[in-house]
Amino acid sequence: KYDFTSPDYRAQKISELARLPITGDAVWIDAGTRRRADFAFADGVFGFYQHRSKAIVPVRCCPLCCAAINDVLPAVASLPWGGAGAVLVTACDNGIDIAVTSAVPYFSSEFKNAAARLDVLRVTWNGRVVVQNATPIVKFGDVSVEYPPGAFLQPTIVGADILRDMVVAAAAGAHRCADLFCGLGNFTYALGADGFDIAGAGVRRDLFHNPLTVGMLNKYDCVVMDPPRAGAIAQCTELVKSNVGRVIYISCNPQTWVRDAEILKQKYSLVSLVPVDQFVGSAHWELFSLFA
């Protein structure tokens, strides 16, 4: 069993960020905490893709995943997987949600019958409900939100809590905040509960091709952004022309963070950059940054 708390692991992983202007100590998340994991299936085999390969390694337990996911993995792996596709397994606050995406448009009756025997909240196939025993729920503080099939969540609860606290602290003193690429509201509800006048965007607005314009941004003195791996180049281009005084940028891709940071530096100074190891056992990092 690999020790993800070892000095060797941490030294090797942090070395991948050697060229970044990091201002604070890295935050390390333990293994066994992932609440969402992407699996693959093909030719009846369910598991993870082998590194740099299209071959699938069968999986019935994952030391990186939380106990709730590992409890159902053997049964999920044993489903009659026809065709090929991807499976997102998510541990919601009240149980497990399974979202299948596949080029095969419809699930078989055999798959439906087998899925009905799983101890899960819901199984969907290309967004169509196969089985639903209850509505999946995720909580952000005191707020309970219905979880749509395949929706984004921070990969770990502890990581989400840490980032949320960092965002609230970095926004201190601001009055009106915009939470862009807000997803289900990991930061939105926390900022609202802390007394900020907060608006969320990104659920229905394509911020990649239709970013908030300067006129829209000028209503706010703080902007929070947590874009997907592609980053937020269009939105950053608008921000540097605006009157927004503070940008809190959370990134899951150091490469696009570097690109976007160069744009933001046309107007702002980098105040802090802290790496968070939410993706234990991989080369990926989460970055928390504040520009002002």
PLM features per residue range, with description:
Residues 1-225, 230-237:
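Accessory RNA-recognition modules of RNA-modification enzymes
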Residues 100, 288-291:
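Short beta-strand element of the conserved SAM-dependent methyltransferase core
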